[in-house]
Amino acid sequence: MEKWHNPSSPKRLRGDTPNSWSELPLDLLTAVFERLSYANFQRAKSVCSSWHSGSRQSVPIQIPWLILFPEYDNNNSCTLFNPEEKGQVYKMKDLGVEFSKSVCTATYGSWLLMRDPLYNLYILNLFTHERVNLPPFESQLGMVKIERTIYDWFHSTLHYNGKEYHKRIRILSTVFWIDEKTKDYVVIWGLGSSCVVYSKKGDKCWNQIPETSNCHHMVYKDHKLYFSTSTYKYEFRIFDFSREIPQQIFQGYVIMQGLTLNRHRGQPGYPFATIDTKLVVTVTGDVLKVDRIVEKETRICRFFYVYKVYSSGSYKKYEKVESLGDEAILLDLGITMLANDTVGLLGNSIYFSGTHTKSKVINDTFIFSLETQKMDPVHKFDCSSAQLSSARWFLPSSHKLD
């Protein structure tokens, strides 16, 4: 019989412990890594070379982090907050002069979709500083011709039935996806009332998706684009991006609202208004619409209404969602995640941040509980209101934090 060693004996502490830890079986290491949060995952993989190798077989438990961007032209660093580590913030430095002058419009994993003041577009990895430059925005293929005017405004000309139609447009909803290993990507923009465009790895221009005018909000998940309009038609469509050319696979209707502070809801004098509506795709593929409700007088977000509008390939009559169960909504990403209280992700909650617009709505960063109908502040940040308004939740992928 093998002799048992006391793990606290001086001899074991002196000689056996380091070798034993470094020689743990791969299946055991994998089981350990799969139970670690992102921050602890990064710490564990640096224990020794064998642990670092073992970490490549695992994916850390994901929990949303918050990123606060620098004020315009102030510095080239940003602040990261991990809700799991109460009071702990990280500073990411040396992101480049251009970073401080750019605006983040979307996130995917550790990647940020950025635009500079001249609307040059690029994707940046927050941790590795890898960068992917995107085609010039004016390089369009389709019926709509795009010409730059100033800053984030563009002029479009639509040629239809021998006639020209001119519009002044602005970039609205943006989404993207990127593969961590191959760097394959797709970036999608909504061009105001004109159309939706996309660009994939290897493209030299932007491709227009026909009949996608009046974009209000989009979500990209599992190679599908969920698209909604803001006109009286309130169209809701799903496009399959797994093919070379995107194909529409569903069409329905979802009422989307935005910037309706002066609109009464219910009886005269009702103190609240819907400031915005977002689409959210659940873990199982259902689609929710989430109304953000603000107090008219103070313009502070007070609560949310959640409705299920699509399930199992069919349009549903609005069904109010009273509980998300063990899922949490990440409103910035338009998705839900399975919650795990051991790493700090709260189920039946909505994680949300600023409006990311120039509206005068007060921007806060909170977690809203559907069970208690109360807001919980995430953290007291030492920053300006402008920084809070541009803050975003993101899901860090498994790269090392320095």
Swiss-Prot record:
Could you tell me which SUPFAM superfamilies the record lists for this protein?
A: F-box domain
What Pfam families is this protein classified in?
Beta-prop_KIB1-4 (PF03478), F-box (PF00646)
* Organism superkingdom: Eukaryota
Name the coiled-coil region(s). none
Q: Where is the F-box domain?
A: 18-64
- Which named protein is this? Putative F-box protein At4g22180
Question: Where does this protein come from, organism-wise?
Answer: Arabidopsis thaliana (Mouse-ear cress)
